[in-house]
């Protein structure tokens, strides 16, 4: 929300409150309070940065305006409002059945909205814990040729970006994730660390809770100093205040603790536990001068009056200049740009934003359906009170007073529903946090905070107005004389009420159809997703992540020897059928490589620009995963690091070698001008879907070897988790400094691949079911009221010879006509709305005919049942009794 929009909102709020001020005082009152508001314009503009005290001060200002407006009202109005409230509460208590149903219906809608809003508030709306977070952005290399929008960059590129731009006040860098091993203590602990430039913390505008952050001098002299996260300080040092100056052994080397960050600080993710200067990175020497080493990510702070669009245009121009100045080959690097992403968007991701907004839209629909239901209940109850209102009008009560009476009752009902809804939301939030997939950012920040409480209060008052307007509108248009003469039953007022109720049913059905279509599409997508083959057999597989202390000296042959010994020892354990190691089974990175096929020109098919990932593996990993061999052979035990052989996956074979046998062909990594180190293709294996089941297969090349972080997988004949202790012991016996973590099973791993979609689909289906139940109850209520209103007519029909089946058709036909109109309207709306969730679908069109037809029949079936019960009751009407009663 922009500064101008924020101020307009508060100005609008003052003007709305001014409506209750007497007209003769209204102009002066508004001028006075608007002038007061303009004095606070600076605070309003900085709303996202204000502490709780200043936010409460602004809210108190609005409350003060409201109380002042009430104070200006005549005393008589205050007394009348108290009388209305007392009378309304008595009437609600007099009809406990109606009151209970209305409160529960509204509480479900309000509770669902509050629970989902609490998630949206924590993930999307709450400011990040930095100074002016809305001016922070991540800067990535944009590689259109490989379709990668967020690639890392090199240190020389960072220096050029920093010196050539005019719109960022500063740029800083950090590594792209740096797992380290804390080797001091009883056993090694693997934590996520980051190498960052000295200006990162000042750029973020965050000061340490203890000590200080490292300086440019620390960076220049390669000082081994470290800043700890609040969590690591508590866990590793027991929150000792004398931690500054103590040593912490990282990857076998001692670093001095110089600072501890605040409890709410994290960057770039909440997994990051410590920060070190960029110059102590194990890969710094030799790599920091490489123009095309993509080891770094860049964060920038926009100048006060700069926009993200302006920054994007400027950085694109800088990127183009650099690509032309430092090309490796025209084919490889020309056209590189820079992608500027607002930090909040970077943290949440566009798909998550869309999913949360879809869920928020779903609960809004549920709330509207609940309001329509309660409005129908209020209309039916209002019809029974027609004579009461007519008598009060005859005794001198004005229509305004009667309308205010009904709105007061609605507000009281909404207030109680809001309190119950808040309780349901509290339970719902706990359930959401418990069942939500762990990759939702800021999950631990989801709480019922003052902002959520304000939202609940606002929603409660809004619902009170929504369901109270229909009966209040009817009272304002009714003629007391007609009501007194006709007694309310079967009157023209009853006809108008049935028409209004019918309109609300149409709206309910349309909203329900829209929800059911969205849920149906998500269900069909999820079913399609579950049928996707992950490329390996997950049953009976144990996975453990193994990390060695990382250093430039401990790469290559030593690492390969370590993993070879571990694999041999684990393979000897009872029940183990096969063991292997792979660099990154979950493929936690983007394609970052390219190849050139021997004998092809630079512009030939399958040259350097295609998406490609290179993985180091042990010789028997495919046997452990049960990945099918399509052509050629697997690696042998003798083929280790530096062997000039590779295995490719099916996607790469199809893309680079269409219609030919790739076995025996040679490739090299990089473009045509790269070093001529050729690798022979000895095998083709099936594709592994490892990031997300719905993600398109990526071209992969597998090389024999190992790095310091590997996934160890063992296929066993019994329960995989029973082997955990033995595997830990074998790894520690080979190298006590190795950290073992991330233990899981293959089955659980595959479930995680679709956890986010399962969560979204489950919630949407739940809300759709609630909507269907509410719509069915609404149809039942309207048809039951219609039968009660037409008892006299039905009695006459039966007395004149109509059969029970005729009455049944009459009542069901009336309800089904309304439902049919609602379904048709909902299908048309769904045809447009379903396109908004296209990005969330997999293997299903947004206009899938089967889903639309299925939803229509489902709602028509539920409506048929809801209509049948009142219709069956109508067939039991005694003609003589109904005529005598009239």
Describe the role of every protein-language-model region.
Residues 116-141, 165-167, 207, 268-270, ...:
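Membrane-proximal juxtamembrane linkers immediately C-terminal to transmembrane helices
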Residues 1-104, 481-495, 876-886:
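Negatively charged linear elements and acidic catalytic determinants
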Residues 52-98, 148, 175, 179, ...:
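Membrane-helix entry/capping segments
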Residues 193-214, 224-354, 430, 522, ...:
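Mid-to-C-terminal secondary-structure elements
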Residues 73-99, 343-349, 377-404, 408, ...:
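Alpha-helical transmembrane segments of integral membrane proteins
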Residues 95-123, 127, 369-371, 415-418, ...:
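Short, strongly hydrophobic transmembrane alpha-helices
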Residues 370-414, 777-819, 823, 836, ...:
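Interfacial "coupling" helices/loops that link adjacent transmembrane helices in transporter permeases
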Residues 128-178, 294-299, 533-595:
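Membrane-proximal extracellular/periplasmic loop immediately following the first transmembrane helix
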